[in-house]
Amino acid sequence: MTIRVAINGYGRIGRMVLRALYEDQVNGKPRRDIQIVAINAMGDIAINAHLTKYDSAHGRFPADVSVDGDYMVVNGDRIKMFCTRNPAETPWGELGVDLVLECTGKFTSKEKAMIHIEQGAKKVLISAPGEKDVDATIVYGVNQNVLKPNDVVVSNASCTTNCLAPLVKPLLEKIGIESGLMTTIHAFTNDQVLTDVYHNDMRRARSAVTSMIPTKTGAAKAVGLVLPALAGRFDGFAMRVPVINVSVVDLTFAASRATSVDEVNAILKTASEGELKGILGFNTLPLVSIDFNHDPRPSIYDASQTRVSADGKLVKVLAWYDNEWGYSVQMLNAAEALMAVK
């Protein structure tokens, strides 16, 4: 049965979710049984269509995009466009919307996201870490099995948690993890500024394109929501750097027993070819961040960067991720998983 989807918020993730859905077809993959029937996007429809077609990070969208009145048309599919800051003005029920992809970053609690249910949608998937009241937080490939039929508002966690969780799951199961510290070296995002402006966070006040900027991230702690055995064991921070896209997780953890570089690499290679195939990548080539641009996998382990201390108990691992594209593909994966639960 086709999942009828509305996207609320058409910024970086909203647009990439749409593109990822259609690019599957272009790349010869079977089309997902998902139909985007509506988008609530601020601004002019023609400009949003233009931004859908042309993208500075991901290039030209290989699909036909046009505007017909209040509709954006993608490869012949008519998508009703709305422009309102108030979701109470969106007629999801009239449009038969099954699932709202909440991509504004503003409705991250169940209490706020329920406005979509009140408007007639059946479920909501949030493209951000959720507040404590959401029904579940999932990373597809790691813990989507926790979903229950009565889950209504679900968080897809963050792009960084979607990278970290597939990386640590096999290591937790095979070696054990006592504690860990993570740094995400993260591409700048549009909540930063081009030139210095006033901001309550003095580092956030500085230009994103001229400095490396330390800032907070909840991704390390949030991994405990996805893998409860790690609750309270991880912490970390982000270092925003002047690149437009692709980020990398640098994780150092205390292992429960002595291990080696070869064992760590073997565990993650096996996982990447088995239970986490398509979710966890495995790389041995001397690549750099741009080489992972537009990669659909949310986590790509770099086996060449693994380090283990002399006593075998301190381990450092590295995983790349396209923080836009990989995460958007995960939104589609999670959407299918959420709507399949009966």
Feature names for model-found ranges:
Residues 173, 177-244:
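Acidic, glycine-rich segments within the central catalytic cores of soluble metabolic enzymes
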Residues 22-26, 169-177, 187-190, 217, ...:
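Generic secondary-structure signature for well-ordered alpha-helical cores
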Residues 157-158, 212-214, 254, 321:
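Hydrophobic alpha-helical scaffolding
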Residues 2, 236, 248, 252-342:
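C-terminal active-site/capping subdomain that shapes the small-molecule cofactor and substrate pocket
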Residues 150-151, 207-209, 246-250, 314-316:
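Short, solvent-exposed beta-strand edge segments and adjacent coil->beta transition regions
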Residues 72, 138-140, 153, 212, ...:
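Short clusters of hydrophobic/aromatic residues that line enzyme substrate/ligand-binding pockets
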Residues 56-57, 77, 95, 143-145, ...:
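Short capping/connector residues at structural and topological boundaries
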Residues 1-205, 309, 333, 341-342:
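N-terminal Rossmann-like NAD(P) cofactor-binding subdomain of oxidoreductases
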